[in-house]
Amino acid sequence: NLELEIATLHSQIRSIEAPESMVQSLRSEIAMLREQLSRATAENERNGTTVPLGPRHQHHRSMASDVPAADVLEFHEDVLDERRGADVPPEEIIDLLEDEAQLDEDVLHGLIEYLKIPLPSLQNPPGPKEVLFPSHLISLVTNEMWKYGLVHESERFLANVMQTIQQHVMDFHGDDAIIPGIFWLSNVHEILSFVCIAESDMLQGVGPGLDGSARDFEWGDYERLVTIVKHDLDSLEYNIYHTWMQQSKKLLNKMVVPALVESQSLPGFITNDSGGRLLNRLLAGNHAPTYTMDDILALLNKTWKCLKSYYVEPSVTQQVITELLKMIGVTSFNDLLMRRNFCSWKRAMQIQYNITRLEEWCKSHDMPEGSLQLEHLLQATKLLQLKKATMSDIDIIYDVCWMLTPTQIQKLISHYHVADYENPISPEILKAVASRVVPNDRNDHLLLPPEVDEAGPYELPAPREVTGIET
């Protein structure tokens, strides 16, 4: 058990004449074991149970699952600094790098599967080291492998790392996918940036073995590996983006219509129309969730906070928010277009108020251009509020609603739900609107292309400047 290991290490220090670096390494290991023992004891006391401690390699897993990222980072940096300062023989380092089981335990489990990700925060954001340390440690291990010519070992190591990250991100669903998805998107891009540096060096003839410490290896194998790993990391970054964005869009798709089209927050403009969805409501019963604009804004806020806290590039942040806003705009516009009873000026007032809340969110987050994704819906609400009594009124509608096609305008006007105190739209007006529709005009479509749950094309940002790793 742990106590026996501590006693054994103490006896080793007393009984051997070792270099000071080795003694310090043993003392560090004792301190780590004591910390694990105290953690396990405290955990057992809280749970009121006694958990048997297994072989030593299992301790890394339990520690990683309980310790926050900052603590893991501090421990690993201490160990790395200590090893860099110590005169460790290359053979010893190579033995560590060739220990596949221990590497898998420390990296695949400790750094990926059981890592406690730092929580996003705009007021007290985690530092870059706290966020990106998994990628830095993975890059450091890779760099050491290449330094000593362990090309095939690094290929196996990186393949397992990429597979584990992808599977880990895919294990999360709904709202739970946002934090790990964005966290690992940023870390994978950091690893990719490290590989891009290695590729640049490789093209200049710089690579493993220049200092004579590397084992024999084929330079062609190294070139092939760097090329393949770069391509695979590129694909992994897209897959991560695709996975968590798909989960976010699925969740958002459930919210859009109830929150943006159906909810009525403005007093004095409440309507009792059913919108032709009475049958659907009866079939769904009371189990259908009710969403409000607060739910949509909460999803946008969480996504924004993660993108900023985990140091994702501004170009990616803009891409993410734009894609989510586009889904909101397209889904709500198409829904409104097909609802006869919702095409009233009171409903238009309610929807316009909800749009205003999204526009204010975009402005407060320095993305005023994001509201362009809502322009079709906004112009539809304006159309429903404008007069439709004379031909000059119709001309004004076509000027104001310049983004809408003639077919969309005809649909909204023909569906317009006249209030009791309003005059019906005259047949002459309806005929004039219909005459503007040109048959077989390919540019004149009714519905906007629907936004599916799948993420759109991902534009890979430029490689970052990676510092602190010797390449």
Label each region the model flagged:
Residues E3-A101, V107, R339, K346-T471:
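Eukaryotic terminal intrinsically disordered regions
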Residues P52-Q352:
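Extended cytosolic scaffolds built from alpha-helical repeats
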Residues N1-A7, F183-S186:
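Short intrinsically disordered, low-complexity coil segments enriched in acidic
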